[in-house]
């Protein structure tokens, strides 16, 4: 089972370090619930993440969805390259960059 730390740096800033993977994503989500609730703006530094996979991407998207449903802002810094690559391949990278809600990122085609 992988290890991780989620450090509260104060004023809505957090640092996630260690594994962000199938082994840890659910636990990270559980650990983050209470400290995230206290803030309307969140900045999560991911530069300490040492291992990531598609479950890590799913975790970040879950946080974006939660933030939008609870009227909060969420931003990521230090995004792991592997997560960015998976996000680009699956065309959800804009969600991470702009914090859009799932339902709003697909635009309707132009009617002519």
Q: What would you call each of these model-derived segments?
A:
Residues 1-52, 61-112:
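STAS-like cytosolic regulatory interaction modules
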């Amino acid at each position: 089972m992988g290890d991780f730390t989620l450090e509260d740096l104060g004023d809505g800033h957090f640092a996630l370090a260690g594994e962000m993977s199938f082994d840890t994503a659910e636990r990270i989500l559980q650990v983050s619930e209470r400290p995230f609730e206290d803030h309307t703006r969140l900045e999560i530094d991911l530069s300490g993440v040492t291992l990531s996979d598609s479950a890590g991407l799913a975790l970040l998207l879950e946080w974006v969805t939660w933030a939008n449903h609870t009227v909060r802002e969420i931003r990521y810094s230090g995004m792991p390259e592997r997560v960015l690559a998976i996000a680009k391949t699956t065309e959800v990278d804009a969600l991470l960059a702009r914090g859009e809600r799932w339902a709003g990122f697909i635009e309707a085609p132009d009617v002519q």
